[in-house]
Amino acid sequence: SSNLLDDNLNILIEKCVEATKNTPEDEFNSLPDKDLLAKEVKDLSLYDDTHIENDQKIDYLKKLELAASNDKKIVNTESSFTQNKSNFILANTEGFCAGYKTSSFTASSLTVAKDEKSMERDYDYSSKCFFKDLDDAGELGKQAADQTIRKLSPKKIGSEKIAIIF
């Protein structure tokens, strides 16, 4: 719960205890042996300490928008760039207390295309732990636009007898 008032926490604890009365017994649901508990947190290489200035984000989005709107059939675009950095702390009653950091960089492009018969929308995105691994803005925008344009003026498929493999 995000409500950390004492009254609310007491109610939450009571509800949790009450819920356990309806839980069937499970011989495999127990605390692990102490020798199985973690003693350290390994570095999983999930954190990029790169700092992205707002000007860099704006430049990336401008390139993304330019590539996404390059075809005259594209009538609208929406692009975004987000950056997230988190800290996780793990602790137990045996004295273990350690943590790790994660980061993510995400860019997306949504495009709307129109022709004389239809209007369609599609998107593409890239989400990576490391900024350097994020897809190129131009490629991402072009991919979103191409996917959207391919959906325009769909053709009906006629009935036919075909083999189905299960």
How should each PLM-predicted stretch be described?
Residues 1-166:
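Active-site bordering "gate/hinge" segments
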